[in-house]
Every structure is written in C-alpha cells, then in structure tokens.
C-alpha cells in the first residue's frame, strides 16, 4: 500500500458527495453499450473502481448482474445506495476471485494505480474472469504519472497498449478508441478506451 494510493482513497472518502455531483453530467451509456455488445447473454460484471455506482446501475437496468467494488469506503456507501447492490470495499491488488465474472468494467479507475503495479493488477483481473471474459478499461490520454488535485493518475496512449495487454497477463485487445470527455465542461480532455478478451 503506497502513499499515492492512500491519498487517492482519502480523497474519495472525504469528497465523495462532491465527486458524485461533479460526474452528474457524465453519461457513459454509449461506452457501456459498446462493452455490453460483447456478451450474447446476461452477464455477471465486476464494476471495478465503481465510484458512485452510476455504471452498475445502468448495467442492472440492461438486465445484467453486477458486483460494484471500490477501495473507498465512502464510494462503496454511495454505490450501494445508487445501484441497490451492496458494494464490496477492496483494493485492486487484493482482488481474490477465480473464474467468476463474464466481464470486468474498470472505467476511469485503474488510472489511479501506479504504472509499475498495473501488470500485477491486470493479472488479478485475468484470474477473476471466466475463460473468454471481457475487460474494459479507460485512462486519461497522455504520458504523465503524477498527483493532481489530491489524486494520483497514470495516463496512457496507444503506445502503452502492449504494456497493458500481452501474453504475460493473458489478454488480447479486441478494440481501442480515443474519446472526448463526456462532461461538457471537460470536452477538451481525451480518454483511451480499451476492450480486451481473456485469452489464457
């Protein structure tokens, strides 16, 4: 457990209500639907770094089963209220599932992990997925790894795709795309979105 992680979790614990308000205009339904298109039946999805539970609620509305999970106690409380499903408080590196989920949705969450820790975390996500399972993850588009306004961020570009998904962690990329932030006031910010499949 690093100081960067502690600061980020503390941020969400103390500013949960403010964060919920700040993303109230963020509609991720298009990205969610793009992810859901890879499932031919009802899926069991781990919403990893679920935040307010916004996306968990949407997945449930589309007929899927979801487990919201977040390292922040306050975010888990909000997500439980929003989604109607009890969220699990757990850090990325403490994931302990095996062949459990059809999909893992990590929207704007893995970006809070330090770069050197991401390979191990992604291997744990691989363990949690059933064979052929689908992973979505998104990062702010860029090359920085730094603290910003009380939270730690690891940015990514297309050049980082082989680092994120490779033979060692058992993922192959199905598609990736660059999008603009869905919040009108942040339309100048870009995101790297990745959808990958568990291949081993």
Regions inferred by a protein language model and the residue ranges of each:
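A short glycine-rich, Lys/Arg-flanked "PGG" loop and its adjoining helix->strand segment in the class I
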Residues: 119-131
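Conserved beta-strand signature within the Rossmann-like core of class I S-adenosyl-L-methionine
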Residues: 132-139
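Class I SAM-dependent methyltransferase SAM/SAH-binding core
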Residues: 46, 52-94
């Amino acid at each position: 457990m690093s100081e960067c992680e502690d600061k980020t979790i503390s941020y969400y614990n103390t500013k949960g209500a403010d964060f919920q308000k700040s993303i109230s205009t963020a509609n991720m339904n298009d990205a969610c639907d793009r992810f859901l298109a890879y499932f031919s039946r009802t899926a069991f999805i781990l919403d990893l770094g679920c935040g307010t539970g916004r996306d968990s609620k949407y997945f449930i509305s589309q007929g899927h089963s979801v487990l919201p999970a977040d390292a922040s106690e306050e975010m888990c409380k909000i997500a439980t209220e929003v989604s109607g499903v009890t969220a699990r408080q757990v850090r990325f590196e403490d994931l302990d599932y095996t062949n459990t989920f059809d999909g893992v949705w990590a929207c704007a969450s893995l970006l809070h992990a330090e770069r050197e820790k991401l390979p191990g975390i992604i291997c744990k996500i691989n363990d949690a997925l059933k064979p052929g399972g689908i992973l979505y993850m998104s990062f702010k588009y860029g090359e920085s790894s730094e603290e910003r306004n009380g939270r730690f961020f690891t940015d990514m570009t297309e050049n980082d795709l082989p680092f994120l998904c490779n033979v060692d962690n058992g993922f192959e990329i199905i598609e990736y795309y660059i999008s603009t932030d869905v919040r009108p006031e942040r339309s100048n910010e870009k995101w790297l979105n990745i959808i990958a499949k568990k291949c081993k």
